[in-house]
Amino acid sequence: MKKRLFSLALASVMVLSLAGCGGSKGAATETKAETTEAAADTAKAEGASEETESEAASEAAAESAGGTLIVGFDQDFPPMGFMGDDGEYTGFDLELAQEVAKRLGLEYKAQPIAWDSKDMELEAGNIDCIWNGFTMTGREDDYTWSEPYMANTQVFVVAKDSGIASQADLAGKIVECQVDSSAEAALKEVPDLTATFKELLTTADYNSAFMDLEQGAVDAIAMDVIVAGYQIQQRNADFIILEDSLSAEEYGVGFKKGSTQLRDKVQATLEEMAADGTLKSISEKWFGEDVTTIGK
């Protein structure tokens, strides 16, 4: 009898044990799934964090290892950046960039680029920044920017004897601007005005635009006032700038989105140059006056 009772008790314990094992296996499976999911989430978060840290580390390593500040610029944009008579690249912006590189202990390299390919060059890492009369207005969220260092306006340049005295006189005329320029962007903001033009053309650079104006192929050029004044002076031509401007804007140095470390170093150096009079000196060399805005 006792043996039978023991057997029944043992059978009951085994049933309970099997039930317990089944429950433990299910719980273990569920716990394992939860653990795996949590681990995946953690790995994903760590991966994102590591990616951000990696980008910052790459930027710092590039500055440290490369030791070069590669400045992207339009070589046909005097006086900001162009090729001088000696075959060397020069200009107001390039002199600023060269001085900044010197103070940061970096090798300076001026890299000419096609203006409509500037974003591709920056994203590919072929250049470290765009520094060449680069308008911030309308592009505020597209780059990591320095603080503005110069004010500018978009204007129209016409022949003095053209009979064009205001924007209203551009009706029925051929107007030209540089492709992918701030002038082109500004013109898109005034469709009522551009609708009166006979034609709106674009060209690769402003040297070509001035040749077109000199030859009478176009009636007006829309462009930066800083560059317009310099071009008129250098060409000693009978061109005038219309008094009613197209838009007001500011120049800044544009870096790849997220390149804050290099931007901060360049910005601090520009502020140092403003404080010791270097910005003023370089500006007076190119424009006859101090047109910079940092520290003012």
Model-derived regions, located:
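Bacterial lipoprotein signal-peptidase II cleavage site
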Residues: 18-33, 40-48
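Extracytoplasmic small-molecule ligand-binding "clamshell" domains
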Residues: 61-133, 276
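Periplasmic-binding protein-like
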Residues: 75, 151-158, 225, 229, ...
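Short helix-initiation/N-cap motifs at beta->coil->alpha
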Residues: 94, 109-121, 200-215, 249
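Extended ligand-binding regions for polar small-molecule ligands
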Residues: 94-103, 161-164, 173-174, 179-182, ...
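Acidic, polar ligand-binding/catalytic clefts
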Residues: 98, 102, 107-169, 240
